[in-house]
A protein has these predicted regions:
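Conserved catalytic-core segment of nucleotide-activated headgroup transferases in glycan assembly
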Residues: 199-306
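Nucleotide-sugar-dependent
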Residues: 235-238, 300-345, 352-362
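A short acidic/histidine/glycine-rich donor-binding loop in glycosyltransferase catalytic cores
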Residues: 364-371
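N-terminal subdomain of nucleotide-sugar transferases
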Residues: 1-84, 247-259
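A short, active-site helix/loop in glycosyltransferases that binds the activated sugar's phosphate group
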Residues: 155-156, 164-190, 200-202, 359-360
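A charged, aromatic-enriched C-terminal amphipathic alpha-helix characteristic of glycosyltransferases
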Residues: 195, 201, 206-207, 372-375, ...
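Active-site proximal beta-strand in glycosyltransferases
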Residues: 118-125, 133-152, 167-170
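Short N-terminal targeting/anchoring amphipathic segment
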Residues: 91-97, 108-128, 144
Length: 410
């Protein structure tokens, strides 16, 4: 068993995801002797962002960090594809896939990945990390599983990863009931709570010294930011369940006198028909509310300095306020969007229509302004202390949960 004064080699497998600078908190922790990051090949840019952050802000601790390109998703998917072509008597079993991996891969797992104090795998149902967790267990490796995004649709590898883990890190206790209903599994005895989306304490302290003036200081209007990788304008679109359909809420905000800044990579008709043309409802709103609705480039928050762009805004919208089918809504009820932490990190007050983020409404009412309509939002703004909207937890706290619990479980 590990002791409280021990130092650890920590090995992480899974997507890096947004805000790679979170890992600065790992490097900065005295208990971490070495962080081995096994990243998937489609995350080379995110990995490079971590390297750049370390070189810029913690060059003296670079020796504590090492990265390895792990072609795991590609290898798994190609093996599955080849076996599917050959097999005609039913679906391909996971044991068949695993037995067809090259010996050099298993040697790498045994000689490299297995040589660690804490093997940490995660975080969601679509990045193939749950499959790797299942394989790790079959090879006799103990691991910690962190989990964030999921759906109310049973997925065999997710269930196996949960069952086989030594313990699981969940964002909050609402996931316990979620998985009871989804799989009839009780995780109470092996679950601890910390959110993988908590942002870096080191970065927050660095930004706290920045002198950034709010845009509202210049024009006296409340500026609302929307961060969304993509938005759609077809209200009948089914694949995203209304998640990316922001037209109604933007129009309501504009009519109430707010200035809205939409930062997005892609504006399309729908996920089913991903085309762009004008006019569309978003460009029509720009014409109707000239100077009050701006469509802008995405803010690359992988670069710490770009938080200063986000810090100019007063309010940050968490979701479109439009629900969808049950399997999506069930997760949204317990979800804490990663944008919530981005906004708090930048001194932006998170706002959300009522009824969507039900867990947050019951537990985060002091950190989010929930409103039934935009006129109520306007009234609520007169009652709050904007300076009180600050993050309560950081990735350093996530790491502490991971290491403290590892001392008891591993």
């Amino acid at each position: 068993m590990m002791g409280p004064n021990d130092s650890y080699t920590l090995s992480r497998i899974g997507i890096i995801g947004v805000a790679p600078h979170r890992f600065l908190d790992v490097i900065n922790d005295e208990r971490v002797e070495k962080l081995n990051l096994y990243y998937f090949e489609n995350e080379k840019n995110a990995y490079n962002s971590i390297v750049n952050c370390i070189e810029k802000y913690m060059p003296d601790k670079k020796k504590k960090f090492e990265g390895f390109d792990l072609p795991w998703p590609t290898m798994y998917n190609l093996t599955l594809m080849e076996l599917s072509k050959q097999k005609t008597d039913g679906p391909v079993m996971s044991s068949e896939i695993f037995s067809n991996f090259p010996n050099v891969f298993y040697k790498f797992v045994k000689d490299q990945i297995a040589c660690t104090d804490v093997l940490w795998i995660g975080d969601n149902d679509f990045d193939t990390s749950f499959i790797f967790a299942t394989l790790s267990s079959m090879l006799g490796l103990d691991y910690v599983l962190s989990l964030k995004e999921t759906r109310f649709v049973p997925y065999g590898f997710e269930l196996e990863a949960l069952k086989r883990s030594k313990f699981v890190i969940l964002p909050h206790d609402g996931y316990i009931d979620f998985f009871k209903r989804k799989y009839s599994i009780n995780l109470e005895k092996k679950a601890v709570f910390a959110d993988i989306d908590w942002r870096s304490k080191f970065v927050y302290d660095f930004l706290s010294n920045s002198k950034v003036e709010k845009l509202s200081k210049k024009d006296g209007k409340n500026h609302v930011v929307i961060l969304s990788g993509r938005v759609v304008w077809n209200s009948e679109e089914t694949r995203s369940q209304g998640r990316y359909y922001y037209v109604p809420i933007i129009q309501e905000l504009l009519e109430e006198g707010f200035v809205v800044h939409l930062h997005t990579k892609v504006i399309i008709e729908s996920l089913d028909n991903p085309v762009y043309y004008e006019p569309n409802p978003y460009t029509e709103l720009m014409k109707k509310f000239q100077g009050s609705f701006l469509i802008e480039r995405p803010i690359d928050l992988n670069d710490v300095e770009n938080y200063k762009l986000l810090m100019r805004y007063d309010l940050g919208l968490l979701n479109s306020g439009i629900g969808g089918k049950d399997e999506f809504n069930e997760f949204e009820k317990i979800n804490v969007p990663n944008r919530f932490y981005e906004y708090l990190h930048a001194g932006v007050v998170p706002i959300s229509p009522k009824g969507m983020l039900q867990y947050m409404e019951s537990k985060f009412s002091d950190q989010v302004l929930f409103f039934k309509d935009v006129s109520e939002l306007r009234s609520l703004l007169n009652t709050i202390d904007v300076g009180s909207y600050k993050p309560k937890n950081f990735f350093a706290d996530f790491l502490q949960t991971l290491l403290d619990t590892s001392e008891n479980f591993l």
